[in-house]
Amino acid sequence: MTRPTLDLPPVGETILTLESVSKSYGSVRAARDVNLEIPRGSIYGFLGPNGAGKTTTIRIIMKIIMADGGSIRLAGRPLTGATRDSIGYLPEERGLYRKMKCLDQLTYLAELKGVPRAEAKQRSDRWLTRLGLAEWRDRKVDSLSKGMQQKIQFAATFISEPEMVILDEVFSGLDPLNIELLRDMILEEKAKGTTIIFSTHMLAEAEKICDAICLIEGGEIILDGPLEKVRADFPLQSVRVAWEGNPEPPADLPGVLHREKSDSSWRLTLAEGVNPRELLPDLMVFGPLTLFSANRPSLSEIFLEAVARHRRGVPS
């Protein structure tokens, strides 16, 4: 089996297009007229709370479930079973042949995607080495820890060198060292030109690696675009402050939405339109400042504000 040859756009131009994609289960609308354009060579974050519709949208892209309406195109071509083979997919529900040896497992899965056997075996060896699992190559999958099995499935997703990869909660259950290892590998694959859809609820990780994001709430895209533009559209700011003697600021400071204690300092989230410098006179009432630092909004703050606006019926 060979993958179809795609007429790929230049890096940065749209490789995957979703137009008015919808899916309902009875009265529940899992995807509501989803429209997306994902740039080639980017890491594109699918973000949203549990049950928001991220996995449903991914399963529609992978043709695991069929949409009720809308269309999907990959590199300008309708997404079919054949063109879908140009997409690697790591689902949230992991699945490996537990009685197969690690090397045999990866080799077999690469062959299923059209990689010749000799090349498939070489790629499998390289991936096992990259993941620090070379000494486990001849061990059965069921003898590996859960985290090690997850790394095997990660390798299986990339081993056929697909044009696009979809990772659904790839870091779930991993320790910090393995999260860092896979994060670095995701960035390496991006550097090779691979387009990566990164579906997660771990906003701090998305903030580290995503070039662009979409935020899904109730099956609907409520926010999307390059991460820097999204930040610019949400001027929500915070300042980190500390005083000599570590006093506690009052909860009703003018221009402050909420406060949060962090070690010996306080993080103050500002109301929209408030200039951090405007706070200084009120803050200095509590004593000499030892720290005053303005911060850009975090992805978590943007997420919370966007969801709150959507639920109030205010466009983001």
Question: Language-model features: where?
Answer:
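C-terminal coupling/interaction segments
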Residues: 2-5, 271-316
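Primarily ABC-family ATPase nucleotide-binding module
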Residues: 3-14
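ABC transporter nucleotide-binding domains
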Residues: 13-16, 23-217, 223
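A structural detector for beta-sheet-dominated domains
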Residues: 19, 39, 242-244, 269-271, ...
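Short, flexible helix/strand-to-coil boundary loops that buttress conserved ligand/catalytic motifs
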Residues: 83, 234, 307
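Structural motif
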Residues: 94, 254-257, 287
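ABC transporter nucleotide-binding domain
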Residues: 183-271
